[in-house]
């Protein structure tokens, strides 16, 4: 089933106006909000790991703040990675909308037509919005890019984690090749990892803006949809 933009105010079904459609299943919504918490935790702790707090003299047992920060970062990284695996699994067994950000139909001319329409809409060139049950094409591209960025962050993060644990650790054995791919310089991996953090922070800012904007201007629910699972058409 294609869920490209609908003409008119809201989609029609069985001869009557549809005001709500169940879109996002519980696992997708859970993944979304768990990922939100992970990104917040990883961004704050990652920044502090890159720019540590001033050293405090005294017994390490009572001044273990950076240790707790690193532990929170590593824990959130594990959760993010497990969540990504679960999200990919649900793309295989979930409904059509669970696959939208995994398999983007860039081979479809109709999809590109909708994509450029949405670009014009976001640039305030188009006067009236279209309705989408799931993600619009711009949203699909954005979320697919985020997924690949998150995968890169997990790979590079576990590579750096493995270097700290030692060459015999599972993390280094599984992801040590990432450092080799960057010329064997872990500082280069660290710099790209940090750039990835700022890129994801920028993505989050745009994502939140776009969701609130669409909620108001396109007259279809966005934020509440990721809570209830239902897309509401308001006109």
Where are these regions (language model features)?
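Membrane-embedded alpha-helical bundles that constitute the cytochrome b-like, heme-associated redox core
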Residues: 1-235
């Amino acid at each position: 089933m294609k869920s490209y933009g609908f003409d008119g105010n809201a989609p029609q079904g069985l001869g009557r106006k549809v005001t709500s459609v169940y879109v996002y299943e519980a696992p997708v919504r859970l993944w979304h909000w768990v990922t939100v918490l992970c990104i917040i935790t990883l961004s704050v702790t990652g920044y502090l790991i890159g720019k540590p707090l001033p050293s405090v003299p005294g017994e390490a047992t009572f001044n273990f703040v950076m240790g707790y920060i690193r532990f929170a970062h590593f824990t959130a990284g594990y959760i993010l990675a497990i969540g990504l695996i679960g999200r990919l699994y649900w793309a295989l067994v979930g409904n059509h909308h669970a696959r939208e950000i995994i398999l983007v139909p860039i081979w479809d001319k109709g999809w590109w037509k909708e994509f450029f329409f949405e670009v014009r809409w976001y640039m305030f060139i188009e006067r009236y919005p279209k309705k989408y049950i799931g993600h619009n094409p711009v949203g699909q591209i954005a979320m697919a890019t985020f997924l690949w960025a998150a995968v890169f962050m997990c790979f590079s993060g576990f590579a750096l984690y493995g270097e700290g644990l030692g060459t015999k650790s599972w993390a280094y054995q599984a992801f040590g090749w990432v450092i080799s791919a960057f010329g064997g310089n872990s500082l280069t991996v660290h710099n790209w990892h940090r750039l990835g953090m700022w890129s994801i922070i920028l993505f989050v800012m745009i994502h939140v803006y776009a969701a609130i904007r669409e909620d108001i201007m396109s007259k279809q629910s966005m934020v509440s949809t990721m809570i209830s699972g239902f897309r509401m058409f308001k006109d």
